[in-house]
A protein has these predicted regions:
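Amphipathic, small/basic residue-rich leader segments at the start of a protein or domain
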Residues: 13-146, 165, 169, 180
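Cysteine-centered functional microenvironments
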Residues: 114-118, 151, 184-189
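Contiguous, well-ordered alpha-helical segments that form the cores/surfaces of helical PPI scaffolds
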Residues: 131-135, 152-157, 183
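Phosphate/diphosphate-binding loops
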Residues: 155, 161-192
Length: 192
């Protein structure tokens, strides 16, 4: 059954098959491509002025880069990260060395700022494409993925609610990987 027959229509768009450029077994690229481009029609987002600099090729390229980084730098230490928790000695936190290497590759890729505007140092990547990228990292190593994902979430809060002074101070360093971020929430009714 072809994608076209599953949709009940003929698709004459040229197709740059995502599964050809992704050499990862973390996520079924054929299914991901079907969801992104046939079900959710993510390519139509490029018709909006905010995303007009992108096309399917750039979307596929960012996803393929994510798959490669996840496969090469996150997946190999998945079990090791689970069995070697971060240690706090009262002054600093120590993780296994592979976490730092994975962090460096993730931050150098630009993915920490991917969903943000160009003016803020981002790629203006649509949320659906960024989520597809994130899925590779979560599949490869949920433990280590927490570091960039919490940083990205903290940066989103700063970008949405902080003063311009704080944005200028923290966002560039978070986006290029010099700073990391977290969210600490308390639940007073359960003893935290």
């Amino acid at each position: 059954m072809t994608i076209q027959s599953r949709l009940g229509k003929s698709d004459t768009r040229p197709r740059f098959i995502l599964r050809v450029i992704i050499v990862s077994n973390l996520i079924n690229a054929k299914d991901l491509e079907f969801l992104l481009y046939d079900v959710f029609q993510a390519e139509q987002l490029t018709e909006l002025s905010f995303y007009q600099d992108h096309d399917k090729t750039t979307f596929d390229g960012v996803i393929a880069t994510s798959a490669k980084i996840a496969t090469d730098y996150f997946l190999p230490h998945n079990a090791k990260a689970d069995s070697n928790e971060p240690q706090f000695d009262g002054e600093s936190v120590t993780t296994i060395p592979e976490v730092k290497e994975a962090w460096q590759h993730y931050s150098q890729s630009g993915l920490l700022a991917a969903r943000h505007r160009y003016n803020d140092g981002g790629m203006q990547l649509p949320a659906i494409i960024h989520t597809a990228c994130v899925s590779y990292f979560m599949s490869a190593n949920p433990s280590t993925s927490g570091y960039p994902f919490l940083t990205s979430a903290a940066a989103n809060l700063i970008n949405a609610f902080a003063s311009d002074e704080h944005k200028k101070k923290y966002l560039p360093a978070m986006f290029d990987g010099r700073f990391s971020g977290t969210m600490a929430m308390t639940e007073p009714d359960v003893g935290s």
